[in-house]
Swiss-Prot record:
Family membership noted in the UniProt record: To E.coli YfjT.
Signal sequence bounds: 1-23
Taxonomic source organism: Escherichia coli (strain K12)
Name assigned to this protein: Uncharacterized protein YkfB
Keywords: Signal
Signal is among the record's keywords: yes
Length: 155
């Protein structure tokens, strides 16, 4: 893990702690800070799923968007973590979150994921093929909060 991605990881943790402490389960929230827009939803046991959309390109000009999963014990895993694969299953289809963007298959997988997450009333998150949580989201809330998620691409 590079210093830059570690810094982003720490920033995400601080942002999550600040606005998810009082999150109502099943409702998406949006937060912004340091050039990152984050969309988070919490489930009843306290696990939080976050989509991180960075406005700061890497040294190659690519936006390295990611997802984070904060577990009930405040342990956090990221799609950027080495040896970590995060898969989201919604509407009977799996979306493997790429560890980096800026390559065709990764960009396509990311686009498919962000194009469909706002329609999901429920989705499961797997970390390294082990189910880590089930999130139920209010659809009307998702339509409103995730309406700008299309900006979270590498186009």
């Amino acid at each position: 893990m590079t210093i830059l991605s570690l810094s982003r990881f720490m920033l995400a943790g601080v942002l999550l702690a600040s606005f998810n402490a009082s999150a109502i389960p099943g409702f998406w929230q949006q937060g912004y800070g340091q050039g990152n827009t984050e969309y988070s939803v919490t489930e009843a046991s306290g696990k939080t799923f976050t989509i991180n959309c960075t406005g700061n390109p890497d040294q190659n000009g690519f936006y390295q968007h990611s997802v984070f999963l904060t577990l009930a014990d405040d342990k956090m895993v990221s799609s950027h973590d080495d040896d970590t694969t995060i898969t989201v299953v919604m509407d009977h289809q799996q979306y493997i979150i790429p560890s980096s963007l800026g390559w065709r298959n990764g960009d396509n997988a990311w686009f498919d994921f962000i194009s469909n997450i706002s329609e999901a009333g429920q989705f499961d998150v797997y970390v390294n093929d082990h189910k880590a949580g089930t999130f139920t989201a209010d659809r009307k809330n998702a339509e409103k909060v995730l309406s700008t998620l299309g900006d979270c691409s590498n186009d």
